[in-house]
Regions:
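Active-site region of the double-stranded beta-helix
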Residues: 1-90, 107-112, 118-157
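Histidine-centered metal-chelating micro-motifs
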Residues: 92-95, 99-104, 122
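A structural signal for short, well-ordered beta-strand segments and their strand-loop junctions
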Residues: 96-97, 114-116
Length: 157
């Protein structure tokens, strides 16, 4: 079984040029809208060009693309295969990123919009959960990025 999981949507109804989706995430108690207006990396590389990641200690992410495409890099030392690259579009469903997973996302030149239907745990503080972590300062993270072949997932497979 893969370490990568998705929360799929349900189509209520389709008409010409319109699709009605149920995108409920029962676990969610928060919602964030993340807009990349053009080519973007979040978090951006650090001052020396090293990749940076977010890691939430008190939040699981359920990232769902609503417009465009977004690519996520995920690193979790507790997984059998610790390095994954996941390509998402609107049909993929919500990518579940469990707490304590290092992650970053990239959009192409046209940008993308993601809704994160997050599950926040007691102790969550926005000022502490969104601090970029550079792989230049985390030796084990740098080692995984350099030595592990990423498992690549495309469009919610």
């Amino acid at each position: 079984m893969s370490d990568i999981h998705f929360k799929k949507h349900r189509v209520f109804r389709e008409t010409e040029d319109v699709i009605f989706y149920d995108i409920s995430v029962d676990e969610s108690n928060a919602a964030d809208l993340v807009v990349h207006t053009g080519a973007a990396i979040s978090p951006p590389n650090d001052a020396v060009g090293a990749k940076q990641f977010y890691k939430h200690e008190f939040q699981d992410d359920y990232n769902r693309v609503v417009q465009g495409c977004r690519t996520f890099e995920l690193v979790n030392g507790n997984w059998k295969y610790p390095y994954h690259i996941v390509h998402l579009n609107r049909a993929s469903g919500a990518l579940i990123i469990p707490k304590n997973t290092y992650h970053r996302s990239t959009s192409g030149k046209d940008g993308s919009i993601v809704i994160n239907q997050a599950k926040r745990y007691a102790g969550f503080q926005a000022s502490e959960e969104f601090i970029p972590i550079s792989c230049a300062e985390q030796h084990w993270l740098y080692k995984i990025l350099m030595n592990e072949k990423p498992v690549i997932h495309t469009l919610g497979e």
